[in-house]
Amino acid sequence: MPTDHFDLTDRVAVVTGGSRGLGREMVLAFAEHGADVVIASRKLDNCEALAAEVDERFGRRALAVECHVGHWEQVDRLADAAYDEFGRVDILVNNAGMSPLYDSLASVTEALYDKVMDVNLKGVFRLSVVIGERMKADGRGSIVNVSSVAAVRPTPGEVVYAMAKAGVNNLTSSLAKALGPEVRVNCLMPGPFLTDIAQAWDLEAFAETARRTMPLERGGRPHEIVGAALYLASDASSFTTGSVLKVDGGLA
């Protein structure tokens, strides 16, 4: 076994929601461990800035792609762009997501419901199938979905999001069976991480809640997703598929 269990030299990783937050951390970690990366999000300028950083810091190739994963035609274009540029994809991370706020369950419109489902579940299904089938034909690949502890510990303020993320957990198990043995499919289930999104939180109230409800008594630091992501993306997890790995400070 190689000294670096997380070695990704010359592999190609596609990361949706890759320009910020946990996605950004994973992009940088994959590049640091030798991978070329495809950075996808709705904000092309952010993707391009991170692609330039990857090249400057690690000397790896990085392709920026604008993509709204809730629209299948854009998902298909993302897959085609990755294969046109690199000829293959070894790692897919379905990280893009959204959890909009609402005043009450009755205030959730059909448009909002569909938007949350489209981004958090429908797009994950489509991109996993489009790239996963090509991975299977190529004889290898690793898909890493990103759900949330909301899937198993929902709150009233995120019901639709929790439904979608529970679907991602189920989809992970289903795709592991459908795409194996060539392709492994696993899932990260993060708890609360102090990414840029956390700037909108009442951090004092969150800190108090964390002390009461989480064994580690704090939110996650963005870089703390990296170890789990590298494990599932790399050959270190070669006998792991269909698994959901909590990275939540013990919350769930």
Task: Give names to the regions the model predicted.
Residues D103-L105, T109-K115, I143, A198, ...:
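Substrate-binding pocket helix/loop in short-chain dehydrogenase/reductase
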Residues S128, A164, T172:
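Active-site helix of classical SDR
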Residues L44, E66-L78, E110, H223-E224:
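The beta1-alpha1 cofactor-binding region of Rossmann-like NAD(H)/NADP(H)-dependent oxidoreductases
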